Each structure stands twice: as structure tokens, then as C-alpha cells.
């Protein structure tokens, strides 16, 4: 999210107001992601979790993305996703962020580090 917040700042500084940057996450959702990319231990743990109420359906996991793509008045300095237990499940809304998530110095350093490591320079 810090990378997205830095992108927001850079777009605002260059007066690009037609672009909106939002951050969302699905929470804990029953998808094939773990089955296709997780190691054996992760797969076993996730399969066990899927037997509990701590994992929601893939459809519910998509709701934060749909909300961010369709709602017009969302705060750009936020994280949207499930707001229930451990922010893994529950109603969709604005999540809780720690104060360091808004650390401008770290955001800028992350942006520059990303440019250095990828060899790409964003012309914003």
C-alpha cells in the first residue's frame, strides 16, 4: 500500500487528477492461489483453515476489488477489505492501518528502491 500511496502523491504532484489509486485485499478466500503456488506446509495449513469460518468464498474475496472499481467516493489513503476477525473475513470496508503505513520517507525510499531493482523509471 505504501507504493500505491507514493503513486497517489506523485500523480497529485504532476496534476494528474483523472487517475485514482485505491488499495484493496481479498482477506482469506477459498481460491486456487495456495494450491497452485504454495509449498506443502502452506497447502496443508490452508486446507485446514478452509474447514473453519476463518476463510470466505472466492466470490466474497472479490468484493473489495469490485467495490474499489465501482464506488466513486472512496478515500485513496486507505486499505479496503474485510473488516471482521483479523481482517480475514467479514463486511467489506476501510481497514485499520498502523501510523507507519503513512510514513512519507519510507514511501519515497520504496519507490526509488523499486525503480532501481526493476530498472524502470516512471515518468509521472
Task: Label every model-predicted segment.
Residues 1-124:
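NAD(P)H-dependent oxidoreductase Rossmann-fold/reductase module
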Amino acid at each position: 500500500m505504501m507504493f500505491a500511496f507514493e503513486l497517489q502523491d506523485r500523480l497529485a504532484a504532476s496534476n494528474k487528477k483523472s487517475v485514482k489509486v485505491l488499495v484493496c485485499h481479498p482477506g482469506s478466500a477459498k481460491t486456487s492461489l495456495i494450491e497452485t503456488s504454495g509449498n506443502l506446509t502452506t497447502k496443508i495449513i490452508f486446507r485446514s483453515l478452509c474447514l473453519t469460518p476463518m476463510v470466505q468464498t472466492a466470490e466474497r474475496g472479490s468484493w473489495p476489488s469490485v467495490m474499489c472499481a465501482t464506488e466513486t467516493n472512496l478515500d485513496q489513503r486507505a486499505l479496503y477489505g474485510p473488516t471482521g476477525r483479523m481482517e480475514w473475513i467479514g463486511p467489506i470496508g476501510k481497514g485499520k492501518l498502523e501510523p507507519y503505513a503513512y510514513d512519507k520517507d519510507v514511501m519515497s525510499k520504496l519507490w526509488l528502491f523499486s525503480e532501481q531493482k526493476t530498472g524502470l523509471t516512471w515518468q509521472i
